[in-house]
Curated annotation (Swiss-Prot):
It comes from Rhizobium meliloti (strain 1021) (Ensifer meliloti). This is NADH-quinone oxidoreductase subunit I 1. Its cofactor is [4Fe-4S] cluster. The gene is nuoI1. It catalyses: a quinone + NADH + 5 H(+)(in) = a quinol + NAD(+) + 4 H(+)(out). GO terms for molecular function: 4 iron, 4 sulfur cluster binding; iron ion binding; NADH:ubiquinone reductase (non-electrogenic) activity; quinone binding. It is an enzyme of class 7 (translocase).
Amino acid sequence: MMAGLSNAVSSLFLKEFVGAFLLSMRYFFRPKATLNYPFEKGPVSPRFRGEHALRRYPNGEERCIACKLCEAICPAQAITIEAGPRRNDGTRRTVRYDIDMVKCIYCGFCQEACPVDAIVEGPNFEFSTETREELYYDKEKLLANGDRWEREIARNIAMDSPYR
């Protein structure tokens, strides 16, 4: 009898409805937990591995010395390098540096293997394309990425350097 009366009182005063409404109102005035993605972007870790880039020295010369360590260590065999002839000062530079982004698994081994920090995976993660051919990066595209993202790349490398 008491259980039936208790249920009737709860139903009469809409106890569950009021409780749910109060809970909704409490969360309504809290800061939002989600971001409106295309317009708002969350923080990206300095160790984030995004679109590849080739870096230059401050004087404008490319950093890559054509040692081919990144090509050798790439587990997906996505990197192809052709070294040019030795220059008068004994150094080499690349004639061809291609990355097949379709094959790339973004493991970061190329960045870790590079002795001069020439190839890096930058902070850019928004590089969708309409055709598959646009995902074959040549040396010019990689150098352009490096020029575009150099400030962020240098900051990320500096922030991560104590842990290397």
